[in-house]
Every structure is written in structure tokens, then in C-alpha cells.
């Protein structure tokens, strides 16, 4: 990004810090994940979990969800004001799985939110440590991105299900702050804005009065976040139009859908971070690793290194393939749901298959599933190489306005050319260049037509051996271009339902 000077790195966003140098960033990110680890260890003690049970990813997710719920001010307030049957607004809990006599058992636990908050603060030097909470939210979001499809959400707002590669972070809660905004895809932002505009169309008072003023500020802020993701002047100018509209309506929805489509070729900048389950940080802290002293980065070798030495287990349903379950979690850990499968496969060192070919359902187990038949297995989360995570969208040789990579949103900064049938995409842009944004639309379409599939993204960037922590010898992989690169090809995943 050319505007690098004005942007905080995403570690700074993640840790809520002002501008810091690299060492300070590494230390504050280290402090954040160390706090998560200490909290996890304490919770395992409270719950009397065995070592094996503490390494079970389902238990990790329950504990993460409990602390997120304990700190969800808005929802807590809502629950207190609207008491619903059988829900204690002061308590939080979930399923904990224990190994008893060679079988897995589910136990529903309930804790005071106040108690959970106390344990969390204690693990984080008495602070609220919002950064750590956001980090957990992003891990859950990355897991959802790898597990579920959002076709229904796309269709409901009038978008095309083929735009699924723009939907990173679509399940992140609103309170996820700057770090959350950085990882949201263009489609996610468009979806949120369209929902807002539709409410305004249906509800006369949405933009009016004191509340309406706050709504308007939120609308403009979201527009600015989305504008910041676009890398071409015409796309940004169109966002200004949408933001400045007196009374946002169908014209703005049209513009936003047009922009989302354009992002399939003129990619937005979307950040990628490797956020790992709490139990992984817990294991490292328990083994005596000092994250704050050693420093940590979400976008470098550190998460790969951590996963090389962590053994995490997962419950497996009777007809699921453990290797496929591992792939799902590996992709979530590296925020690689939207990455080109050929790049992921090369880095992982084993073939990564499209979601339609996976014999596995989500990681979480529903409360009505039968535990009698549950087994568990080790998740294989190691990798053959590591690569730097990107925030650029993969536009070629630093031309801001060239093609990014279609049908994927690159996660790793690794050279590849662009597997796309431009004709297929351009077909989505039939006709409509009228209206007040016509010149911008024409300009955007022209740029898209000039994008060529032979272009190379991330020129000269490669992957690195795991022994090469300073990233000195890039290995530039060559890919078989005939393969379909999208994970969503032949999709058969379940829909995400809140």
C-alpha cells in the first residue's frame, strides 16, 4: 500500500496500540497471546480438565465463547432488560467434553460471567485486554469462513453467490474494532451496508432523530472502511458518492453491488492473520514459553512454528475423515479459506482439496448429537513451508489498478499467476453504465477489461523453509495452472446460521 505511512500495522490495530516499532509490536502481540494462554490454563484448572481434554479443540472453543460472551456488554445489557425464559443473563457456559471409561461424554457447564471476567483480567495483568478478545473473535470468524458457505446471505441482499470469495469475516461481531475491520472482505462490507440501506428504505425513522444521527455516523464510517479497501481511484470515487448520498436507497445498493463485482478482478486490500485456538497458546505458556519476551507476530513465521510443536485433538463423528478435519482447521488457523488451493497445498505440503470434496462437517458439535459414537483424533496442523501473510489483495507488480486474483483472496504473499476466465466475470457487467456514477463505472470496466490472466501476482515472492526464520531464501513455487484454484468449487458446505 502506498499510504503505508498513515496506516497502523494490523498488529497495532490488534493490540490497540499507537505507532510502535517492530520490536514493540512483537512484544505487545506476544503479551496479548500470552494472556490468552494464561487464561486458558487457568480455565482448565477450574474445570479440572486432563491434559488430553485441555487439548481438545471443542473444549477450547467453548472456553473462548464463554469469555467472549462474558465481555459482550451490549448483549449482557439486552439480556438484563429483556429477560427470556430459562436464560440467566449473569451466567455463561457451554459443552465441555470429558473422557470417561474410554468414551467421550458431554457435560454442560455454567459459570458466572463476573467470575470469567475476573479470571481473564487476572491472566492479563488486571486489564480488560480487548485485543485478546478480538483475536479470539477473528479465530472464530476464520473457522466459520472455512466451514460454512454464505450463499443464502449473498442472495438475500441481491448479490451473486459467485462473490463468495469476497466474504471474509462475514460472521465477525460488530464490536470487533479496527482489527476486525481490517480482515473483513469487500463483500462483507457491502453486505453490511446494503442491510443498513434496506432498513432505511423500510423504516422511515431509521435516519431521523438522535438515533438516526448515530446511524448516519456508523454508515459513513463503514463506507470509509470499504473505501480504504479499494485500490483504484474510480472505485474510491464511487464509494465517496455512496457515502455522501443524502438519502441512501436503491441507487446506492446498485452501486455497491457493482463495486463488489468489480472487486472480483480489481481486488480489495484485506488483511490476513493467523489466529490460533486458545488451547495452542495455553500449551506454549504451560511449557514455559514467554511470548512477551520472545515477541510474536500474526503474519510471519511464529504461528507456523507454534503449530509445528502443538498437538491438538478433535472429536470426530463416525463417518468423518480425520485428514479432512485437519485441513479445515489448518485453513482456519492461517485464515486461508479464500486462498488459491495450489498455493495452500504447496505451503502445507499435502494436497488441500475444495470444500465440496471434504468428508467432514463443522468442528463444533450440536447439543443433540449422539456422543456414544464419537471418537477423537489428532489434528495435523503442521506445514512444509511458511509464507508471509498479505494485506494487499495480490495486485500485480505494484500497479495499484491491475488485476488481483480472481475467485480467491490471497492470504500468502507468494508469486502466482491469475487463474481466471475474464469472459465469465465480464458477463456479470452487462449494460448498466447510466446514472451519476456512469463515468466511474466505465472507467472501472475499462480497467477490468485490460486485466490479463497472464499477469503475475506478488512477483518474486516465495515460501520459506521453516528453518529460515529471517526469510532470506525465498523459494518461488511453480504451479500447475490447469487446476481449479478455488476452495468453493463444487461447494457442499452447510449454510452459516447464527
From Swiss-Prot:
GO terms, molecular function? RNA binding; structural molecule activity
The sequence motif named Unconventional nuclear localization signal is recorded at 1-18
InterPro entries named among the record's database cross-references: Flu_NP (IPR002141)
UniProt entry tagged with the keyword Ribonucleoprotein: yes
| Pfam families with a match to the protein in the record | Flu_NP
Q: Name the principal localization, coarsely classed.
A: virion
Its PTM note reads:
Late in virus-infected cells, may be cleaved from a 56-kDa protein to a 53-kDa protein by a cellular caspase. This cleavage might be a marker for the onset of apoptosis in infected cells or have a specific function in virus host interaction.
Question: Looking at the record's lineage, which domain of life comes first?
Answer: Viruses
Motif segment (Bipartite nuclear localization signal): 198-216
* Free-text function comment from the UniProt entry: Encapsidates the negative strand viral RNA, protecting it from nucleases. The encapsidated genomic RNA is termed the ribonucleoprotein (RNP) and serves as template for transcription and replication. The RNP needs to be localized in the host nucleus to start an infectious cycle, but is too large to diffuse through the nuclear pore complex. NP comprises at least 2 nuclear localization signals that are responsible for the active RNP import into the nucleus through cellular importin alpha/beta pathway.
Q: Which family does it belong to?
A: Belongs to the influenza viruses nucleoprotein family.
Query: Which protein is depicted?
Result: Nucleoprotein
Amino acid at each position: 500500500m502506498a499510504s503505508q505511512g498513515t496506516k497502523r500495522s494490523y498488529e497495532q490495530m490488534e493490540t490497540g496500540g499507537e505507532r510502535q516499532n517492530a520490536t514493540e509490536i512483537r512484544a505487545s502481540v506476544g503479551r496479548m497471546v500470552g494472556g490468552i494462554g494464561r487464561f486458558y490454563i487457568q480455565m482448565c484448572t477450574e474445570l479440572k480438565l486432563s491434559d488430553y481434554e485441555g487439548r481438545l479443540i471443542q473444549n477450547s472453543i467453548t472456553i473462548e465463547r464463554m469469555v467472549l460472551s462474558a465481555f459482550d456488554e451490549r448483549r449482557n445489557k439486552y439480556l438484563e432488560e429483556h429477560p427470556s425464559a430459562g436464560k440467566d443473563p449473569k451466567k455463561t457456559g457451554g459443552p465441555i467434553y470429558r473422557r470417561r471409561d474410554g468414551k467421550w461424554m458431554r457435560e454442560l457447564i455454567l459459570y458466572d460471567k463476573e467470575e470469567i471476567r475476573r479470571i481473564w483480567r487476572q491472566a492479563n495483568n488486571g486489564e480488560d485486554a480487548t485485543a485478546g478478545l478480538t483475536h479470539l473473535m477473528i479465530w472464530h470468524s476464520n473457522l466459520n469462513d472455512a466451514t460454512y458457505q454464505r450463499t443464502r446471505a449473498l442472495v438475500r441482499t441481491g448479490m451473486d453467490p459467485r462473490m463468495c470469495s469476497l466474504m471474509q469475516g462475514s460472521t465477525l461481531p460488530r464490536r470487533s474494532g479496527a482489527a476486525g475491520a481490517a480482515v473483513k472482505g469487500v463483500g462483507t462490507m457491502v453486505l453490511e451496508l446494503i442491510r443498513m440501506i434496506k432498513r432505511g428504505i423500510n423504516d422511515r425513522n431509521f435516519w431521523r432523530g438522535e438515533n438516526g444521527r448515530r446511524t448516519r455516523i456508523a454508515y459513513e464510517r463503514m463506507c470509509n472502511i470499504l473505501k480504504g479497501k479499494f485500490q483504484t481511484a474510480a472505485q474510491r470515487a464511487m464509494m465517496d458518492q455512496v457515502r455522501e448520498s443524502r438519502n441512501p436507497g436503491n441507487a446506492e445498493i446498485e452501486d455497491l453491488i457493482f463495486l463488489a463485482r468489480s472487486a472480483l478482478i480489481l481486488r480489495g486490500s484485506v488483511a490476513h492473520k493467523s489466529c490460533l485456538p486458545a488451547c495452542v497458546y495455553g500449551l506454549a505458556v504451560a511449557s514455559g514459553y514467554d511470548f512477551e519476551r520472545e515477541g510474536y507476530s500474526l503474519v510471519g513465521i511464529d504461528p507456523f512454528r507454534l503449530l509445528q510443536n502443538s498437538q491438538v485433538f478433535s472429536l470426530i463423528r463416525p463417518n468423518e475423515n480425520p485428514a479432512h478435519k485437519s485441513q479445515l482447521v489448518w485453513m482456519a488457523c492461517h485464515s486461508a479459506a479464500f486462498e488459491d488451493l495450489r498455493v495452500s497445498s504447496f505451503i502445507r505440503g499435502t494436497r488441500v482439496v475444495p470444500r465440496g470434496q471434504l468428508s467432514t462437517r463443522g468442528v463444533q458439535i450440536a447439543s443433540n448429537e449422539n456422543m456414544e459414537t464419537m471418537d477423537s483424533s489428532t489434528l495435523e496442523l503442521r506445514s512444509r513451508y511458511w509464507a508471509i501473510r498479505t494485506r494487499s489483495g495480490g495486485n500485480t507488480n505494484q500497479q495499484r489498478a491491475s488485476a488481483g486474483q480472481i475467485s480467491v483472496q490471497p492470504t500468502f504473499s507468494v508469486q502466482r499467476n491469475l487463474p481466471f476466465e475474464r469472459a465469465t466475470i465480464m458477463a456479470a457487467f452487462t449494460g448498466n453504465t447510466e446514472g451519476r456514477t456512469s463515468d466511474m463505472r466505465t472507467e472501472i470496466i475499462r480497467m477490468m477489461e485490460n486485466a490479463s490472466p497472464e499477469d503475475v501476482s506478488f512477483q518474486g515472492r516465495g515460501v520459506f523453509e521453516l528453518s529460515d526464520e529471517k526469510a532470506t531464501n525465498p523459494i518461488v513455487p511453480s504451479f500447475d495452472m490447469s487446476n481449479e484454484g478455488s476452495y468453493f468449487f463444487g461447494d457442499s458446505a452447510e449454510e452459516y446460521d447464527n
